[in-house]
Amino acid sequence: MDKEEEPHPLLQDLHRPLQPCTNKCYCKKCCYHCELCFLQKGLGVRYHVSRKRRKTSTQDNQDPIRQQSISTVQRNGQTTEEGKTEVEKAAAAN
């Protein structure tokens, strides 16, 4: 009777931390294949904090149009005095 009683294997499994599962499928069979998949895929429970992705923006990769200010992009949108005089000269020549 000096022999210590070992707990049941089911109780050992309950207290063991969940092993990571690398299965990426969300079908019904894969969602119920283990406890971790059921919690994550079936119920949508996440116990880890998801990291937000950093913006990996460098000056070389950005579009030059987006870097310019609004006034710079639309600078040729309005007529100028030089444009008016050229049009008037062309009209007077006809």
UniProtKB/Swiss-Prot annotation:
Reply yes or no: does the keyword Ligase apply.
Answer: no
Keywords assigned by UniProt, alphabetized: Activator, Host nucleus, Host-virus interaction, RNA-binding, Transcription, Transcription regulation
Do you know which InterPro entries this protein is assigned to?
Answer: IV_Tat, Tat_dom_sf
Q: Name one GO cellular component term.
A: host cell nucleolus
Major place of residence: host cell
The Gene Ontology biological process terms listed for this entry are:
positive regulation of viral transcription
**Protein localization:** Host nucleus, Host nucleolus
A single Pfam family it belongs to is Tat
Q: Where on this chain is Nuclear localization signal, and RNA-binding (TAR) (motif)?
A: 49-55
Q: Where is this region: Disordered?
A: 51-94
Q: Where is composition skewed (Polar residues) in this entry?
A: 58-80
Spell out the molecular function terms from Gene Ontology.
RNA binding; RNA-binding transcription regulator activity
Q: Where is the composition biased (Basic and acidic residues)?
A: 81-94
Core as annotated region, ranges = 38-48
Family under the similarity heading = Belongs to the lentiviruses Tat family.
Q: How does it assemble?
A: Interacts with host CCNT1. Associates with the P-TEFb complex composed at least of Tat, P-TEFb (CDK9 and CCNT1), TAR RNA, RNA Pol II. Interacts with CCNT2; the resulting complex is unable to bind to TAR RNA.
Function (record text): Transcriptional activator that increases RNA Pol II processivity, thereby increasing the level of full-length viral transcripts. Recognizes a hairpin structure at the 5'-LTR of the nascent viral mRNAs referred to as the transactivation responsive RNA element (TAR) and recruits the cyclin T1-CDK9 complex (P-TEFb complex) that will in turn hyperphosphorylate the RNA polymerase II to allow efficient elongation. The CDK9 component of P-TEFb and other Tat-activated kinases hyperphosphorylate the C-terminus of RNA Pol II that becomes stabilized and much more processive. Extracellular circulating Tat can be endocytosed by surrounding uninfected cells via the binding to several surface receptors. Endosomal low pH allows Tat to cross the endosome membrane to enter the cytosol and eventually further translocate into the nucleus, thereby inducing severe cell dysfunctions ranging from cell activation to cell death. Through.
Designated name of the protein: Protein Tat
